[in-house]
Amino acid sequence: MALQSESTGPVSPSVDPAEIAKFSRLSAEWWDPTGKMAPLHRINPLRISFIRDAACRKFERNAKSLSCLSGLRMLDIGCGAGLLCEPFTRLGAQVIGIDPSATNIAAAKLHADKSHLAIDYRCTTVEEIDPRERFDIVMAMEVIEHVNDVPAFLGRCAALMKPTGIMLVATLNRNWKSFALAIVGAEYVMRWLPRGTHQWDKFVTPDELEQHLQGLGLVVTEQSGLVFNPLADRWRLSPDMDVNYMVVAETAP
């Protein structure tokens, strides 16, 4: 049975209550592209295109179609205030967004209502989702570096995939470069993120992530790094996975 916190919602084994509280404090900032969540707004177009294109390749859809994800069930784990849920709803997906922070879910619902979008937002954790529910696309974007038990968390994510589904994971590599750029640079020098947003020892290397996924009977089919160009002031997809990276996984043949 999940523990209940008035301010942060349900807590389960893989959830770190301190991480929930941290992002709850940012709930009012989620949709401000120049505020504390500006880094996510900057990187969001790349995340959206990567996920959309991976899904369209898997399900043989035309990525240029404005309804290319029509009929697909999508689960966004750790959805925050819906920065991914809204664009994928507009592309036709049936989106369920979950987050253990009640304040984040409230912010997400408010923004979706203002945008006239029907999104199923739930203040819950992946462990609390009915195991009979299945999804074509399961997303855990910038989440696993904030959970307590990565293997258990990924196991629950995998259990919610349809046999023909895909899982997308975005996280941060663990090395000296990610410490220098994602923590010292982003939190202390550039001040893109509040200090303490990330804990370097919770970062996950691509090899570790792939081993976890293989242990669940999944195979990585696509992967990409995300690299920031300070001269152009923009992010781009790159083979360089030293800091930020994303992977796509599906059931092994």
Swiss-Prot record:
Enzyme Commission designation: 2.1.1.222, 2.1.1.64
Enzyme class: transferase
Organism: Rhodopseudomonas palustris (strain BisB5)
Lineage, top ranks: Bacteria, Pseudomonadati, Pseudomonadota, Alphaproteobacteria, Hyphomicrobiales
GO annotation, biological process: methylation
One annotated GO molecular function: 2-polyprenyl-6-hydroxyphenol methylase activity
A Pfam family reported for this protein in Swiss-Prot or TrEMBL: Methyltransf_23
Function: O-methyltransferase that catalyzes the 2 O-methylation steps in the ubiquinone biosynthetic pathway.
Assigned keywords, A-Z: Methyltransferase, S-adenosyl-L-methionine, Transferase, Ubiquinone biosynthesis
Protein name according to UniProt: Ubiquinone biosynthesis O-methyltransferase
Chain positions recorded as S-adenosyl-L-methionine binding sites: 47, 78, 99, 141
Keyword Methyltransferase tagged: yes
Swiss-Prot/TrEMBL catalytic activity: a 3-demethylubiquinol + S-adenosyl-L-methionine = a ubiquinol + S-adenosyl-L-homocysteine + H(+); a 3-(all-trans-polyprenyl)benzene-1,2-diol + S-adenosyl-L-methionine = a 2-methoxy-6-(all-trans-polyprenyl)phenol + S-adenosyl-L-homocysteine + H(+)
Similarity remark: Belongs to the methyltransferase superfamily. UbiG/COQ3 family.
Keyword presence, DNA-binding: no
InterPro entries: SAM-dependent_MTases_sf (IPR029063), UbiG_MeTrfase (IPR010233)
Pathway: Cofactor biosynthesis; ubiquinone biosynthesis
